[in-house]
C-alpha cells in the first residue's frame, strides 16, 4: 500500500476516538467481579505501565504547542515534519496566496491529482487572479480616459475681449437707458487694465464699476442729505472726486431710480405680509 493510501485512511479515520493498544490491558481483571458486591475494582491494575496521556501523544510530534492546548488538526501530526509545519505557520497571507497559485507542489499532498490545480498555476496580469480574468482588466483600462490627452487639448475659452468689442456693445446700448452711456464709455477705458490683470480669462463678465469706493462713499453721503443736487454742489463734488460734471449727474439719476425700485419692493413686501 502506498503512502497516498495511508494518508487517505488516516483522513477517513480522523474523527474516530483514540484508543490505547490492546496488549496494555492483558493483566486487567474483570470490571465487576462476583466475589464481592461492595468493592469495585478499577480496570487498571497497579503494576500496569504508566500510559502517556492522549493529548501528549497527539502533540508529541509537533513540538510547537503546549500539551494543554488542544489543536483541531492533531491527528495529522505524524504525517508532517517539524520544519514543514514551522514554514507553513510562518507564511504571510500574501505569500500563501502566491504559493497556492504558483507553487502547487507544496500542497500537492492534500489533493488527489494535480489536474484540479492546473487552472490556478497560470497567473494572469493581476498577479493573483488566473488568466481568464485578464479580459475584464483590458476592458476596464480601455474605458479610462487618458489624462495626457485631456491636458493637450487647447484652451477654447473665450477671452474677455467681448467687453471691449463695440459690435457686441452696440446691441446692448440700444436696450439700455441713455443715462448708462457714460458708464459704458468709462468701462471701455478699463478694458486694457483687465487684459493686463488676467481677469478677462474668467467666463463670467466682470461687473462694471467705474467709480472707486471712496467716490461711491462720498456720493452716497451727499445723496443721503440731498436726493436732488444743484449745479453748484455737482461741480464741487466733481472737483473733489476727480469726476466730470456729467458723471456726477448720471450717478444721481441712477441712484434715484434705484431708490424708487427699492421703495416699490419694500411696499410689496409689507403689504403682502399679513403680520405688518
Curated annotation (Swiss-Prot):
GO terms for molecular function: DNA-binding transcription factor activity, RNA polymerase II-specific; RNA polymerase II cis-regulatory region sequence-specific DNA binding. PROSITE patterns: HOMEOBOX_1, HOMEOBOX_2. Residues 139-207 are annotated as: Disordered. It holds the Pfam family Homeodomain. Residues 204-263 bind DNA. Residues 139-149 have a biased composition (Polar residues). It is found in: Nucleus. It comes from the Eukaryota. Its main location: nucleus. Keywords: Developmental protein, DNA-binding, Homeobox, Nucleus, Transcription, Transcription regulation. The keyword RNA-binding does not apply. One of its GO terms (cellular component) is nucleoplasm. One of its GO terms (biological process) is embryonic skeletal joint morphogenesis. PANTHER family: HOMEOBOX PROTEIN HOX-A11-RELATED, HOMEOBOX PROTEIN HOX-D11. Belongs to the Abd-B homeobox family. Sequence-specific transcription factor which is part of a developmental regulatory system that provides cells with specific positional identities on the anterior-posterior axis. This is Homeobox protein Hox-D11a. It comes from Danio rerio. The lineage of its organism: Eukaryota, Metazoa, Chordata, Craniata, Vertebrata.
